[in-house]
Regions:
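Short, compositionally biased
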Residues: 29-45
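Short hydrophobic beta/alpha edge segments that flank linear recognition/processing sites
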Residues: 12-29, 52-60
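Short histidine-centered loop motifs in beta-beta connectors
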Residues: 4-14
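Histidine- and aromatic-rich ligand-binding microenvironments
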Residues: 1, 20, 31-34
Length: 233
């Protein structure tokens, strides 16, 4: 996965929900966080102390999970958030790691700016959950996430959708540099690589970022009510 973790906790340590687990030595500002509250019972290393796994014993009762506090914003306040604040929030919450670079699918360097951002809001894989169902109750957060992500770069942010998703997003208020592109057809028309080929392929002199619609919804929720980003049930 092109990273070198530096552990910030020891075995037996109490950990909080969304507490930093380790940064990446290659990009020290890129943080990976704990997905639950409990105790780090095992940190397994292999040859040359290569990190293999981290075992977390979650609280059994599931009540009153302690978590790292995050800033929340109203919708009008989000429209005025500067790019640096958005990046800081994504880095601290570990949602920055949901973004991938083209063509090598690495976690991007936050100090660099991509030429364009591509968001996949369709899935043509067999038996895959349809995006028209998954974000049905998350459309407002999907729109918020799109508008926040569009501030990360100066060029276009593309979101490719199927016909039904396109209908769900009509009459929504989007940033001026965001463009929706509808794709139709059987698999592999919903693959990120396939659509990138037509919209704007990556190259050695053209850095692009991409991510999926579920992560866009999570980003919208993170800045709205961060305590609900990871369910406690």
């Amino acid at each position: 996965v092109y990273m070198k973790p530096t552990m910030l906790v020891a075995e037996g340590s109490k950990v909080l929900l969304s507490q930093p687990l380790f940064p990446d030595k290659i990009n020290p500002s890129v943080m990976f966080t704990f997905p639950g509250c409990g105790r780090a019972s095992l940190i397994k290393r292999g040859h040359q102390r290569k990190l293999q796994s981290v075992l977390i014993e979650l609280k059994q009762d599931g009540k009153g999970d302690e978590q790292v506090s995050r800033n929340s914003y109203t919708e009008p306040a989000m429209s005025n958030l500067p790019r640096d604040t958005i990046i800081e929030g994504l880095l601290a919450s570990s949602l920055w790691t949901s973004i991938r670079t083209g063509p090598f699918s690495k976690v991007p360097d936050p100090t660099r700016q991509a030429h364009s951002l591509f968001i996949n809001a369709m899935d043509t894989n067999q038996l895959a959950a349809q995006p028209t169902v998954v974000p049905k109750d998350g459309v407002p957060h999907f729109v918020l996430g799109l508008n926040l992500l569009s501030k990360l770069l100066q060029h276009k942010t593309y979101v490719w959708v199927g016909r039904k998703v396109d209908a769900q997003l009509k009459e929504k208020a989007f940033a001026s540099n965001l463009k929706a592109q509808e794709f139709r057809g059987a698999h592999p028309s919903g693959l990120t690589g396939t659509d990138l080929h037509y919209l704007g392929p990556a190259g050695s002199d053209k850095l692009i970022w991409s991510l999926n619609y579920q992560d866009v919804i999570a980003i919208g929720k993170l800045f709205t009510f961060p305590s609900r980003l990871i369910p406690h049930d």
